[in-house]
Amino acid sequence: MRALILGGTAESRELALLLLQSGWRVTSSLAGRVKEPKLPLGEVRIGGFGGPPGLARWLMDHEVDLVVDATHPFAEKISISAAEATRATGIPLIALHRPAWTPENYDEWIYVNDMEEAARKAERYHHIFLTIGRQKLAPFANDSHNLYVIRSVDPPEGPLPKRHRLILSRGPFSVQDEKQLMRDNQIDALVTKNSGGSL
Protein backbone atom coordinates (compact mmCIF):
# COMPACT_ATOMS: atom_id res chain seq x y z
CA MET A 1 0.00 0.00 0.00
CA ARG A 2 1.25 3.46 -0.86
CA ALA A 3 0.28 6.77 0.75
CA LEU A 4 0.94 10.33 -0.29
CA ILE A 5 1.05 12.70 2.67
CA LEU A 6 0.67 16.37 1.81
CA GLY A 7 2.69 17.67 4.70
CA GLY A 8 5.03 20.19 6.17
CA THR A 9 3.54 20.00 9.68
CA ALA A 10 4.54 18.16 12.84
CA GLU A 11 1.41 16.04 12.47
CA SER A 12 2.43 15.00 8.95
CA ARG A 13 5.85 13.86 10.16
CA GLU A 14 4.27 11.84 12.98
CA LEU A 15 1.82 10.26 10.54
CA ALA A 16 4.60 9.34 8.09
CA LEU A 17 6.39 7.47 10.87
CA LEU A 18 3.21 5.65 11.96
CA LEU A 19 2.36 4.57 8.41
CA LEU A 20 5.92 3.40 7.73
CA GLN A 21 5.86 1.36 10.93
CA SER A 22 2.59 -0.20 9.74
CA GLY A 23 4.17 -1.34 6.47
CA TRP A 24 3.00 1.42 4.14
CA ARG A 25 5.21 2.93 1.47
CA VAL A 26 5.05 6.68 2.19
CA THR A 27 5.85 9.72 0.10
CA SER A 28 5.58 13.08 1.85
CA SER A 29 5.14 16.16 -0.29
CA LEU A 30 6.35 19.54 0.95
CA ALA A 31 5.52 22.87 -0.69
CA GLY A 32 9.12 24.08 -0.69
CA ARG A 33 8.47 27.41 1.02
CA VAL A 34 10.94 26.74 3.86
CA LYS A 35 14.62 26.66 2.89
CA GLU A 36 15.61 23.89 5.31
CA PRO A 37 12.43 22.01 6.25
CA LYS A 38 12.23 19.33 8.90
CA LEU A 39 12.04 16.21 6.78
CA PRO A 40 9.82 13.25 7.59
CA LEU A 41 10.92 9.65 7.29
CA GLY A 42 10.21 7.93 3.99
CA GLU A 43 10.35 9.37 0.50
CA VAL A 44 10.11 13.14 0.18
CA ARG A 45 9.21 15.31 -2.79
CA ILE A 46 9.39 19.08 -2.73
CA GLY A 47 7.41 21.45 -4.92
CA GLY A 48 4.04 21.68 -6.58
CA PHE A 49 2.25 19.19 -8.80
CA GLY A 50 0.83 21.59 -11.39
CA GLY A 51 -2.66 21.92 -9.97
CA PRO A 52 -5.33 19.22 -9.72
CA PRO A 53 -4.57 17.65 -13.14
CA GLY A 54 -0.86 17.33 -12.31
CA LEU A 55 -1.59 15.86 -8.89
CA ALA A 56 -4.10 13.38 -10.35
CA ARG A 57 -1.52 12.29 -12.92
CA TRP A 58 1.14 11.89 -10.20
CA LEU A 59 -1.24 9.81 -8.06
CA MET A 60 -1.98 7.45 -10.95
CA ASP A 61 1.63 7.24 -12.16
CA HIS A 62 2.79 6.32 -8.63
CA GLU A 63 -0.10 3.94 -7.90
CA VAL A 64 -1.12 5.76 -4.72
CA ASP A 65 -3.77 4.05 -2.58
CA LEU A 66 -4.43 6.88 -0.09
CA VAL A 67 -3.87 10.64 0.11
CA VAL A 68 -3.64 12.38 3.46
CA ASP A 69 -3.93 16.17 3.61
CA ALA A 70 -1.89 17.08 6.69
CA THR A 71 -0.92 20.55 5.47
CA HIS A 72 -0.96 23.80 7.40
CA PRO A 73 -4.53 25.00 7.99
CA PHE A 74 -3.92 28.05 5.78
CA ALA A 75 -2.50 26.07 2.83
CA GLU A 76 -5.78 26.25 0.94
CA LYS A 77 -4.56 25.75 -2.64
CA ILE A 78 -3.09 22.30 -2.10
CA SER A 79 -6.13 21.20 -0.08
CA ILE A 80 -8.40 22.18 -2.97
CA SER A 81 -6.09 20.45 -5.46
CA ALA A 82 -6.08 17.29 -3.33
CA ALA A 83 -9.87 17.22 -3.13
CA GLU A 84 -10.25 17.68 -6.90
CA ALA A 85 -7.50 15.18 -7.81
CA THR A 86 -8.79 12.44 -5.50
CA ARG A 87 -12.35 12.99 -6.68
CA ALA A 88 -11.17 12.61 -10.29
CA THR A 89 -9.12 9.47 -9.58
CA GLY A 90 -11.33 7.81 -6.97
CA ILE A 91 -8.43 7.59 -4.51
CA PRO A 92 -9.49 8.03 -0.87
CA LEU A 93 -8.58 11.33 0.82
CA ILE A 94 -8.24 11.86 4.54
CA ALA A 95 -7.90 15.45 5.76
CA LEU A 96 -6.42 16.09 9.19
CA HIS A 97 -7.81 19.18 10.90
CA ARG A 98 -6.30 20.73 14.01
CA PRO A 99 -8.77 22.13 16.50
CA ALA A 100 -8.68 25.94 16.37
CA TRP A 101 -7.52 27.88 19.40
CA THR A 102 -10.33 29.49 21.37
CA PRO A 103 -10.16 32.58 23.56
CA GLU A 104 -10.06 32.12 27.30
CA ASN A 105 -11.44 34.44 29.97
CA TYR A 106 -9.93 37.91 29.78
CA ASP A 107 -8.42 37.32 26.33
CA GLU A 108 -8.99 40.19 23.93
CA TRP A 109 -9.13 38.72 20.44
CA ILE A 110 -9.73 40.88 17.39
CA TYR A 111 -10.76 38.93 14.31
CA VAL A 112 -9.87 40.28 10.87
CA ASN A 113 -10.49 39.22 7.28
CA ASP A 114 -6.99 39.76 5.87
CA MET A 115 -3.52 41.08 6.66
CA GLU A 116 -4.35 44.59 5.46
CA GLU A 117 -7.06 44.83 8.11
CA ALA A 118 -4.72 43.27 10.69
CA ALA A 119 -2.10 45.93 9.91
CA ARG A 120 -4.63 48.75 10.37
CA LYS A 121 -5.75 47.33 13.72
CA ALA A 122 -2.15 46.72 14.87
CA GLU A 123 -1.20 50.38 14.48
CA ARG A 124 -3.07 51.26 17.70
CA TYR A 125 -0.54 49.23 19.72
CA HIS A 126 3.18 49.88 20.33
CA HIS A 127 5.11 46.59 20.41
CA ILE A 128 3.56 44.09 18.03
CA PHE A 129 4.62 40.45 17.72
CA LEU A 130 4.09 39.07 14.19
CA THR A 131 3.98 35.29 13.73
CA ILE A 132 2.30 35.21 10.33
CA GLY A 133 5.05 33.79 8.16
CA ARG A 134 7.48 35.57 5.89
CA GLN A 135 5.23 36.27 2.91
CA LYS A 136 2.46 38.44 4.38
CA LEU A 137 4.44 41.23 6.07
CA ALA A 138 4.15 44.01 3.47
CA PRO A 139 0.89 45.49 4.88
CA PHE A 140 2.75 46.26 8.14
CA ALA A 141 5.63 48.09 6.39
CA ASN A 142 3.80 51.44 6.31
CA ASP A 143 3.79 51.77 10.12
CA SER A 144 6.91 53.76 11.01
CA HIS A 145 5.92 54.49 14.62
CA ASN A 146 5.60 51.12 16.30
CA LEU A 147 8.08 48.32 16.95
CA TYR A 148 7.39 44.98 15.28
CA VAL A 149 8.98 41.78 16.54
CA ILE A 150 8.85 39.42 13.57
CA ARG A 151 9.46 35.70 13.97
CA SER A 152 9.93 33.57 10.90
CA VAL A 153 11.67 30.33 9.98
CA ASP A 154 13.36 31.96 6.97
CA PRO A 155 14.20 35.60 6.16
CA PRO A 156 11.07 37.57 5.18
CA GLU A 157 10.15 38.51 1.65
CA GLY A 158 9.26 42.06 0.69
CA PRO A 159 9.24 45.31 2.67
CA LEU A 160 9.32 45.34 6.47
CA PRO A 161 8.27 47.94 9.04
CA LYS A 162 10.89 50.63 9.64
CA ARG A 163 11.18 49.65 13.30
CA HIS A 164 11.46 45.89 13.57
CA ARG A 165 13.36 43.12 15.25
CA LEU A 166 13.71 39.89 13.31
CA ILE A 167 13.89 36.52 15.06
CA LEU A 168 14.72 33.60 12.78
CA SER A 169 13.55 30.53 14.65
CA ARG A 170 11.58 27.34 14.17
CA GLY A 171 9.07 25.95 16.68
CA PRO A 172 7.62 24.32 18.51
CA PHE A 173 7.91 26.91 21.28
CA SER A 174 6.97 26.35 24.89
CA VAL A 175 4.34 28.53 26.53
CA GLN A 176 6.97 29.60 29.08
CA ASP A 177 9.40 30.70 26.35
CA GLU A 178 6.64 32.56 24.49
CA LYS A 179 5.66 34.46 27.63
CA GLN A 180 9.30 35.36 28.28
CA LEU A 181 9.77 36.62 24.72
CA MET A 182 6.67 38.78 25.09
CA ARG A 183 7.85 40.19 28.43
CA ASP A 184 11.36 40.86 27.13
CA ASN A 185 9.97 42.79 24.16
CA GLN A 186 7.09 44.49 26.02
CA ILE A 187 4.63 43.01 23.52
CA ASP A 188 1.15 44.50 23.76
CA ALA A 189 -0.34 42.85 20.65
CA LEU A 190 0.13 39.56 18.83
CA VAL A 191 -0.80 39.09 15.18
CA THR A 192 -1.04 35.44 14.24
CA LYS A 193 -3.08 33.02 12.17
CA ASN A 194 -5.37 30.73 14.14
CA SER A 195 -3.72 27.55 12.93
CA GLY A 196 -4.68 25.66 16.09
CA GLY A 197 -2.71 22.93 17.74
CA SER A 198 -1.78 22.13 21.30
CA LEU A 199 -0.39 24.63 23.79
Regions of interest found by a model, annotated:
Residues 27-50, 105-108, 159-165:
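N-terminal beta-loop-helix "entrance" segment that forms/cooperates
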Residues 28-36, 96-102, 115, 134-136, ...:
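Short, polar loop motifs at secondary-structure junctions
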Residues 139-171:
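Histidine/lysine/aspartate-rich catalytic loop segments that bind and position anionic ligands
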Residues 158-199:
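A C-terminal functional module that forms or caps the active site or interfaces directly
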Residues 42-59, 167-177:
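Glycine-rich, highly charged phosphate/nucleotide-binding loops
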